[in-house]
A protein has these predicted regions:
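PLP-dependent aminotransferase class I/II
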Residues: 1-178
Length: 178
């Protein structure tokens, strides 16, 4: 994607921020990656089931918080559940700004929970700014971005990890959002 950071650099706690410096292509699957992917297909149903389980646990735990979560499963659709996207609001149900959102991310990192933002709108990246794009022309994209946080959601999370993430979210929300 022409990103300024590779995936490994973005795994450092609280270091979600990156820039897209040009509208380039991302293509990094090798034959080895494809072979690994084929092997993963054998456990794909288990992966989806575990993700769905974690999503349900998270969503049940956050009903009393000033957050809104992306719906993964309805009668009309179901998602792969690879991201748990949460939008942050204050006690008056007003969407928080990026400063508050980033403070939330930092406090979560201090508690040992790596969160992320999916995704920074393209007009905010250098490569697209150079092409004349301006985020002011995309107010809906900015509104979705400004208060969005993505929680850990992967099949290597055990139940204790999930409960710890919930505890950290509740603690951080009580300090910052309420």
């Amino acid at each position: 994607h022409g990103q300024s950071k590779d995936a490994f650099a973005k795994t450092k706690l609280g270091a979600w921020e990156y820039d897209i410096v040009g509208p380039w292509y991302k293509c990094n699957m090798t034959d080895v990656h494809a072979a690994i992917g084929l092997g993963q297909m054998k456990r794909y149903d288990r992966i989806l089931a575990r993700r769905k389980e974690i999503i349900g646990i998270y969503s049940d735990a956050f009903t009393d918080l000033p957050v809104k979560v992306l719906s993964h499963y309805t009668k009309e659709y179901s998602a792969s559940g690879h991201l748990y996207i949460m939008r942050l609001f204050d006690k008056d149900n007003v969407a928080v700004d990026t400063k508050v959102r980033n403070e939330f991310i930092t406090k979560m990192a201090e508690l040992g929970v790596a969160t992320n933002v999916h995704y920074k709108p393209l007009p905010m990246h250098t490569g697209y700014k150079k092409l004349g794009f301006d985020i002011k022309n995309y107010p809906n994209a900015y509104e979705q971005f400004k208060n969005e946080v993505t929680l850990p959601l992967h099949t290597r999370l055990n139940d204790e990890d999930v409960e710890y993430v919930i505890w950290a979210v509740k603690k951080t929300a009580s300090e910052i959002l309420m």
